Amino acid sequence: MAEYTGGSIKADHLCVLVHGLWGNPAHMKNVARRLRAEFPEDQLYILVAKKNAGSFTYDGIELGGERVCREIEDQLEEIKSKGGNIKKLSIAGYSLGGLVARYAIGLLYSKGVLDELECQNFTAFASPFLGVRSPLRGFTNQLFNVLGARTLSKSGHQLFTIDQFRETGRPLLAVMADPKSVFMQGLARFKRRTLYTNIINDRTAVHYTTGIAKRDPYADLTKVKVNYLPGYEPVVLDPSNPVTQLPHEEVKKDFQTRARAYAANLPFVLALSVFLPMGVVAFLITSAIQTVRSSKRIELHEKGLAGIDIRTYRSVPLIIKEIRNQIEDAYEELNSRQHQDYLPASQEVSSDSDDEEDNKQPKKEQKQPTVERKPSVRRRRSSAASASHHLPTLALTAEQFEMIDGLDGLGWRKYPVWIHKVRHSHAAIVVRSDKESFSEGEVVLGHWAKEEFLI
């Protein structure tokens, strides 16, 4: 990967890549490779974060963000010491790395580092902005969401939003989506905020959380016509009109269609019934061991004995102008077996600030986008919005609905992605390893580097 990272002292733009849960820098190799193919070393300096790899990702978004922030500061200092002058900053996070990157951005903002840089791109690939809590109700909620939250140490608590972050009394992800937080203020500095979300087969982070959405128009793809982005078919959907509802007579959801689908999935179901129990046991044992190790690392970190002086990161206010008080496969398969629940019609949320706006593409880049919505301004609704009016609202928590409203207030360029060749679309979206079945991820990375990345 060394041939793709780094850069020359002539480069004035630093791009930081952050891997996900259980990940390591090698997972971002093809992301770096695609960037380097588009931008030479004298134009773009590429840093792949290294200090939060493997089981260290169990330690929580906060600790991961502090580690990445330290790496960015160290890299800026190193480049400067060699005679370089970085003027621009871009950050891209994959999976949990998107959340870790957002935390690091908040720290960089609070320390004034972003005041000295032109913030260009923030990109998230399959990042669970709303956590990984499945939209479930009743007993299933207790079984999956409550149990799952306790298998990944501090990261698990934060991803399932059962934590209380410092003295705020709120989950960290909720604080990070508060328009008055340093995390949102920092994110607002970036000229372009882009996300790529898998519409199916992402067993780690499903569409509603990676796409920041209250509804799921891709729950039954037999009922819609998928519209692709010209030049990037059949992988990247057209964000302005991703799907078109099919007339009733064209819906091919008859008995024969279901029977064929079941027959095609039968080998997978049989294999799952054999290997899943063994995988779950191994996963729980590994999680218990890693949770104990993570707790020890967290204790050392909090005492300032892990190589980072946390006082430089903990002395800044989290909220602006307001008091603060106001093994992977087993996990993925468990998550994939949970079907999304929906709110009863009587509890449907208002659609005024809903995902009607989710796929709106900004027509003009703004240097300083405002964080707070202007309630008097009614945004023009896209064709994608009208197509989702009839869809039921997912059974999210009140905090998740607030997170959606807060995050959407920033303005995003959202690209739905359909990976066809492999069930493991979460890994394929960034071509996490050199497999032919992951080749569709090259289309995603190509679109990002060519069409989205501002140099």
Task: Label every model-predicted segment.
Residues A2-G54:
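Short, surface-exposed "cap/lid" segments of acyl-processing enzymes
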Residues H19, G65-P171, K191:
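Serine-dependent carboxylesterase/thioesterase catalytic core
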Residues I46-G54, K82-S90, A213, I298-E302:
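Short amphipathic alpha-helical segments embedded in low-complexity Lys/Glu-rich regions
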Residues A26-R33, Y58-G64, Y103-L107, S134-T140, ...:
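Short coil/turn segments at secondary-structure boundaries
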Residues H13-V16, A26-N30, R34, L63, ...:
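Acidic, Ser/Thr-rich intrinsically disordered and amphipathic helical segments
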Residues M1-Y4, L21, R34, Q75-I79, ...:
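Eukaryotic intrinsically disordered and solvent-exposed regulatory patches
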Residues A2-G7, E41, G131-R133, Q142-N145, ...:
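Extended, polar/charged low-complexity intrinsically disordered and coiled-coil segments in eukaryotic
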Residues G7-C15, Q43-N52, S81-G84, T123-F125, ...:
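Surface-exposed beta-strand-to-loop junctions
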